[in-house]
Design a protein with these regions (language model features):
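Residue-level preference for the first positions of well-ordered beta-strands
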Residues: 1-2, 134-138, 203
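Active-site-proximal alpha/beta segments of enzymes that process anionic O-linked groups
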Residues: 3, 8-133, 142-148, 258-282
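Short loop segments at secondary-structure junctions
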Residues: 48-49, 241-246
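A long, amphipathic alpha-helix that forms part
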Residues: 116-133, 157-208, 237-240, 256-258, ...
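Histidine-centered active-site microenvironments of extracellular/periplasmic hydrolases
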Residues: 201-203, 207-243
Length: 283
């Protein structure tokens, strides 16, 4: 299974430009539990809301009681690919350099912070030349994420992007949409690669942590904490490359249990999938 958190992916752009990549798809939407990433990641991993797991910012630790039964405990093997969670890059701000274990004690098994490396891991999983296999690849994609939304990487910490906030504020709605769509198109290419590499045997679930403000409602750009009053920030897409009924109550809290259910249905109980896995792992 590939579980994809498409950071900052808006529902309207997803429906308009990403529908139809897979032969079969089922779509839905829900309201984000928060409109920035850290508490959403903790919620998806633990299946608990922020008031239970306690994450309010990127450097927080997760309440250990919320980590007794995480998403990853239901997979024999998994890897996480994320710019936030992977091996800490040198450009991390001071607030993060002493907190390289992202949202501990969640066991992410992060292997890289390079967004492009996901293709390598999916390719290695499905290549008959290797005996590597991961039951879950958790991919936190930044292809639709804009630097104007990363307020913790400010002028003092990253001078190279010190003018991004001002630049985005000065751009027109049309310009913002144009540049945002480039990221959406890149993400579409990646989804097509996942489909082709696995011959659509891999179950792929895509959802967003929050949307993105692009001056559709007032002058706001990017994303920020407490942005539920902006519809394009609060409404997020979710879809699966299977003909499936997505529950009406799906949200960031219930997502964990539904993902586990889909994994059991389409992979653990899928004879074709399990036969291929056995051949690979016997090598």
């Amino acid at each position: 299974m590939i579980l994809i958190l498409a950071d900052s992916l808006r529902y309207d752009f997803a429906v308009r430009y990403l529908k139809g990549v897979f032969p079969e798809e089922s779509w839905s939407s829900f309201e984000a539990i928060e409109t920035f990433t850290a508490p959403v990641l903790a919620t998806v991993a633990t299946g608990t809301p922020p008031e239970v797991h306690g994450v309010k910012w990127f450097t927080d630790e997760v309440n250990p009681d919320a980590c007794k039964d995480t998403l990853f405990d239901h997979f024999d093997s998994w890897v996480t690919i994320s710019r936030l969670i992977g091996n800490g890059p040198k450009w991390l701000p001071p607030s993060r350099r002493d907190n390289l274990n992202f949202l501990p004690p969640i066991r992410w098994n992060a292997v890289t912070n390079n967004d492009d490396d996901v293709l390598e891991y999916v390719g290695r999983k499905w290549s008959i030349a290797t005996n590597e296999w991961w039951d879950l690849i958790f991919y936190h994609s930044w292809l639709t994420h804009g630097p104007w939304g990363v307020d913790c990487y400010g002028p003092k910490e990253l001078p190279c992007i010190k003018n991004c906030d001002r630049l985005m504020a000065r751009m027109t709605k049309e310009e913002l949409h144009k540049w945002y769509k480039i990221g959406v198109d890149d993400f579409k290419t990646r989804l097509m690669a996942f489909k082709n590499i696995s011959n659509n045997l891999e179950t792929v679930i895509v959802f967003a942590d929050h949307g993105e403000a692009l001056k559709d409602e007032g002058g706001a750009t990017g994303h920020f904490k407490g942005g539920h009053h902006i519809a394009d920030l609060a409404k997020v897409p979710i879809w699966i490359n299977r003909r499936e009924t997505i529950p009406d109550d799906i949200n960031h809290v219930t997502l964990k249990d539904w993902v586990i259910k889909m994994y059991k249905k389409y992979e653990l109980d899928n004879s074709e999938y399990q036969e291929y896995k056995e051949k690979i792992c016997r090598k």
